[in-house]
């Protein structure tokens, strides 16, 4: 596939990346940039005696004691590593403080993984769910521990030596999304995860409502973006399983192969609906269009570096693998940017109201403004279509 320096809007690639739900997993010997677990952060401790009582009778060996560590860097849900009788488990719970309605629904993520895992092996298996908030103060669940690494700022040296490593990971990443969207939602019963009819309309309205509830500053440009998304909704292709947060740092890669995806993580927003909404959000993270208002706030994206798929290559491989018409992908990219802005605004709203003391969130207001400016500039840009490819599905 030919390389290209332009995105779906005909503008240069962005050098900007937001990471607000990241996790790092590794075994010994990997780069310090991919640290595994560490001590539990102050203020995020769990009630170990209460947890131990709950585990007894559910996990063999729990009566002999448990050890607890934490996966670093997450900006929303909290993720811990449990060791019980020599076996590792992952515990997931929602964030501290008040959260937006329907956000960070650990019970739903547990049930989604229960349904998806048998049909998409990259989704981790889950074991136990507690909806009794008296145990840890929030709903939580246990799932299997998978080993691998998540790429962020650079490729570890032992992998960088592999021929064409970045290109091969790019291919595997796109192909994994293609497989996810190929799961038969009718035969597997996954259609029960959502209501495909009216998916885009509900997405725009639902995220607009979340924005209104979390607003801290007036942003007329966001009102314009919401109106544009409401008035320009394209016809959706046939519905599929939708991850709703598919990005490089939500995918666990093999430590010794460029072609193998060990796990896809963070399924709390998964549903069934328009697969191009997934693709649009993924493209927002992959390599963004250049925007002056973001230059001072961003950092170079790993996928903007030499060897990685360009956005054109990414879109073309997806089109060839699915046969879907991507001529309206520009709409879905604006939708993705809009959703990212709302997610960050919800986190910033919690910080402004003192519901979290995490200082990592103090500059999220500036990031939100940059995203809104980017979305607003894109809806006014004349080239909004990608060439038609494949057959409409």
Show where each model-derived region lies:
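Catalytic-loop of the protein kinase fold
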Residues: 241-243, 248
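Active-site activation/catalytic loop segments of kinase-like enzymes and analogous catalytic loops
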Residues: 277-322, 336-353
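Juxta-kinase regulatory segment immediately upstream of eukaryotic protein kinase catalytic domains
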Residues: 29-61
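Short hydrophobic alpha-helical segments enriched in small aliphatic residues
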Residues: 8-10, 14-17
């Amino acid at each position: 596939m030919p390389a290209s320096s332009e995105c779906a809007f005909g503008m240069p690639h962005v050098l900007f990346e937001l990471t607000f739900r990241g996790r790092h997993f590794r075994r010994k010997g990997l780069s310090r940039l991919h640290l595994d677990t560490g001590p539990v952060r102050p203020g995020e401790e769990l009630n170990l005696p209460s947890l131990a009582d709950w585990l007894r009778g559910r996990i063999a060996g729990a009566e002999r004691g448990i050890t607890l560590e934490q996966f670093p860097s997450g900006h929303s849900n909290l993720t811990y590593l449990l060791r019980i009788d020599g076996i590792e488990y992952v515990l997931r719970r929602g964030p501290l403080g008040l959260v937006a309605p329907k956000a960070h629904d650990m019970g739903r993520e547990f049930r989604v993984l229960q349904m998806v895992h048998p049909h998409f092996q990259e989704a981790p298996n889950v074991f136990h769910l507690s909806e009794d908030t008296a145990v840890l103060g929030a709903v939580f669940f246990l799932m299997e521990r998978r080993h691998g690494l998540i790429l962020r700022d650079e490729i570890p040296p032992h992998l960088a030596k592999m021929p064409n490593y970045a290109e091969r990971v790019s291919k595997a990443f796109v192909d994994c999304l293609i497989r996810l969207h190929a799961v038969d939602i009718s035969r597997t019963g996954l259609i029960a995860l959502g209501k495909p009819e009216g998916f885009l309309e509900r997405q725009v309205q639902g995220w607009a409502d979340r924005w209104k509830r979390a607003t801290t500053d007036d942003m007329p440009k966001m009102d314009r973006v919401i109106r544009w998304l409401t008035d320009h909704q394209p016809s959706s292709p046939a519905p599929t399983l939708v991850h709703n947060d598919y990005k490089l740092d939500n995918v666990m890669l093999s430590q010794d192969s460029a072609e193998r995806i060990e796990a896809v993580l963070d399924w709390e927003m998964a549903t069934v609906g328009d697969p191009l909404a997934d693709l649009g959000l993924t493209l927002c993270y992959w390599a963004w269009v250049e925007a002056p208002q973001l230059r001072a706030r961003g950092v170079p994206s790993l996928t903007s570096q030499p060897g990685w798929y360009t956005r054109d290559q990414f879109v073309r491989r997806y089109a060839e693998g699915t046969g879907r018409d991507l001529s309206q992908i520009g709409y879905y990219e604006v939708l993705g940017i809009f959703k990212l802005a709302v997610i960050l605004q919800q986190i910033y709203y919690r910080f402004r109201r003192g519901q979290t003391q995490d200082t990592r969130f103090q500059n999220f207001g500036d990031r939100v403004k940059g995203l809104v400016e980017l979305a607003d500039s894109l809806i006014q840009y004349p080239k909004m279509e990608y060439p038609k490819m494949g057959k409409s599905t």
